[in-house]
């Protein structure tokens, strides 16, 4: 077994599964597998049929979901996860749609031609004929783990839709500045101020997008878990075929701060590069006080810019109060914007511009795009985000095969 496969297997075992730490000794309890076979609840290290299956490849969304559903609550020893192991020892068939328990999302192979369930015309329209991944089929928003000013390091394959925008100045020097979110194989959603206006004068021309990055200081990103080295695939650098800026955006203003980047190539999904879900018909917008997450490579308490992907949970801020706060700065907050944060030293800023504000609703949805704020991490001064649900019609009308 190669070092990489060992890494994938360990990552699968230690991160995808919730680990049950306890002292009971209910060894080999009977259980039912996700495909409704009788099995025994045992350590995954004793279940060759599951362990061998998941050591062989980079996991698809369906395989990730199957492994999660195979988890059971048996006895534990240290940090060993327990799974429902088929009684006949055969390799599992991964969760066909007809065997998924009622009330859970079905899982079918992901791909650009995926369509909505029959009879759901509204969702079919929202998916633009399959150009957007379907949240109901776990085709997006699947993150193994759970810039961030006051944040912490993300897991190596957490938030795999995060994109880094690269710019080139007149001297030919390149640097990363803004962020973005991969929404399908050809498009990244970001902030308009990251692609036109002052950013061009300050950073240079936008030339490429990097996907699957974890540590900008290393060529191959690796972390150590339980004395086992886990390494990511090399990041993907994609050229930009075209830039689509919302027609309402004006340089140095903040309204309609949203843009689409059409990549010059179709992106192949891996465990480290996947799309985030867009808010569709059944998405419930966040209320004041709810916790959403931001991720990126921006400023931290220790550094002007983080080399390692960061994450931070922040609360949605009362909209009316946010309008009042920013009115004192001669800045108008519209209903197409969302405010979040406002705790000291916990904010998204600088290098996080254009990056995602995410809401977990079974899968991860892109609810906001980092737009602007009043400095970084100030007490009772929330950041302002472009509210993505308000722009879904624009997004749908501007993507193509």
Swiss-Prot record:
Inhibited by serpin SRPN2. It comes from the Eukaryota. Glycans are attached at residues 88, 330. Residues 1-26 form the signal peptide. It is found in: Secreted. The record marks 147-148 as: Cleavage. PROSITE patterns: CLIP, TRYPSIN_DOM, TRYPSIN_HIS, TRYPSIN_SER. The keyword Disulfide bond applies. GO terms for biological process: innate immune response; positive regulation of melanization defense response; protein processing; proteolysis. GO terms for molecular function: serine-type endopeptidase activity. Residues 30-85 form the Clip domain. InterPro entries: CLIP, CLIP_sf, Peptidase_S1_PA, Peptidase_S1_PA_chymotrypsin, Peptidase_S1A, Ser/Thr_Proteases_Immune/Dev, Trypsin_dom, TRYPSIN_HIS. Gene3D superfamilies: 3.30.1640.30, Trypsin-like serine proteases. Disruption phenotype: RNAi-mediated knockdown in female does not affect lifespan and basal melanization. Simultaneous RNAi-mediated knockdown of SRPN2 and CLIPB9 in female, reduces the spontaneous melanization and the lifespan shortening occurring in SRPN2 RNAi-mediated knockdown. Disulfide bonds join 31-84, 41-72, 47-85, 178-194, 322-339, 349-376. Transmembrane segments: none annotated. SUPFAM superfamilies: Trypsin-like serine proteases. The keyword Disulfide bond applies. GO terms for cellular component: extracellular space. The active site is at 193 (charge relay system), 257 (charge relay system), 353 (charge relay system). Belongs to the peptidase S1 family. CLIP subfamily. Forms a covalent heterodimer with SRPN2; the interaction inhibits CLIPB9 protease activity. The clip domain consists of 35-55 residues which are 'knitted' together usually by 3 conserved disulfide bonds forming a clip-like compact structure. This is CLIP domain-containing serine protease B9. It comes from Anopheles gambiae (African malaria mosquito). The gene is CLIPB9.
């Amino acid at each position: 077994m190669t070092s990489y496969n060992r890494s994938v297997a360990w990552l699968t075992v230690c991160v995808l599964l919730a680990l049950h730490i306890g002292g009971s000794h209910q060894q080999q309890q009977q259980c039912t597998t996700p495909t409704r076979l009788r099995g025994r609840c045992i350590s995954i290290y004793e279940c060759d049929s599951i362990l061998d299956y998941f050591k062989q490849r980079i996991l698809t969304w369906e395989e990730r979901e199957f492994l999660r559903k195979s988890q059971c609550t048996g006895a534990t020893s240290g940090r060993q996860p327990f799974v429902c192991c088929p009684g006949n020892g055969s390799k599992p068939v991964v969760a066909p749609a007809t065997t998924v328990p009622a009330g859970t999302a079905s899982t079918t192979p992901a791909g650009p031609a995926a369509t909505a369930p029959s009879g759901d015309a509204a969702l079919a329209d929202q998916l633009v004929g399959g150009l957007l991944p379907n949240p109901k089929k776990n085709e997006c928003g699947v993150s193994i783990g759970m810039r961030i000013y006051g944040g912490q390091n993300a897991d190596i394959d957490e938030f795999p839709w995060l994109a880094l925008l690269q710019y080139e100045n007149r001297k030919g020097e390149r640097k990363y500045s803004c962020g973005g979110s991969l929404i399908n194989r050809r498009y990244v959603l970001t902030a308009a101020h990251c692609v036109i206006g002052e950013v061009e004068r300050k950073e240079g021309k936008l030339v490429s997008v990097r996907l699957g990055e974890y540590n900008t200081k290393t060529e191959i990103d690796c972390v150590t878990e339980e004395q086992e080295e886990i390494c990511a695939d090399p990041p993907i650098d994609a050229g930009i075929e075209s830039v689509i800026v919302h027609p309402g955006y004006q340089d140095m203003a903040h309204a309609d701060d949203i843009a689409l980047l059409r990549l010059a190539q179709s992106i192949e999904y891996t465990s480290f590069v996947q799309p985030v879900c867009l808010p569709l018909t059944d998405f419930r917008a966040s209320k004041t006080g709810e916790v959403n997450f931001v991720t990126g490579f921006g400023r931290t308490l220790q550094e002007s810019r983080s080399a390692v992907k960061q994450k931070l949970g922040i609360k949605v801020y009362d909209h009316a109060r946010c309008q009042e706060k920013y009115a004192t700065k001669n800045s108008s907050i519209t209903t197409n914007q969302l405010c979040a944060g406002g705790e000291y030293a916990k904010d998204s800023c600088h290098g996080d511009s254009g990056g995602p504000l995410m809401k977990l609703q079974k899968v991860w949805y892109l609810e906001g795009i980092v737009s602007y704020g009043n400095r970084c991490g100030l007490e009772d001064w929330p950041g302002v985000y472009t509210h993505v649900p308000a722009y879904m019609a624009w997004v749908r009308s501007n993507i193509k095969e």
